């Protein structure tokens, strides 16, 4: 069962994106390089609680 997770910018801590993740097959935290509209640049976004 896929759960909805939130991705937060590592620089400004804004929560910009939501996505789904299967926690049984991928127990580690996700990290993507995505565009942050508050920083106005591409930054790493990590999964938050």
UniProtKB/Swiss-Prot annotation:
One of its GO terms (molecular function) is structural constituent of ribosome. Keywords: Ribonucleoprotein, Ribosomal protein. InterPro entries: Ribosomal_bL33, Ribosomal_bL33_CS, Ribosomal_bL33_sf, Ribosomal_zn-bd. Pfam families: Ribosomal_L33. GO terms for biological process: translation. One of its GO terms (cellular component) is ribonucleoprotein complex. Belongs to the bacterial ribosomal protein bL33 family. This is Large ribosomal subunit protein bL33. It comes from Syntrophotalea carbinolica (strain DSM 2380 / NBRC 103641 / GraBd1).
């Amino acid at each position: 069962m896929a759960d909805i997770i939130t991705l937060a910018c590592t620089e400004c801590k804004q929560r910009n994106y939501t996505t789904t993740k299967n926690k049984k097959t991928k127990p580690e935290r996700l990290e993507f390089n995505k565009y942050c509209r508050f920083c106005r640049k591409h930054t790493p976004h990590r999964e938050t609680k």
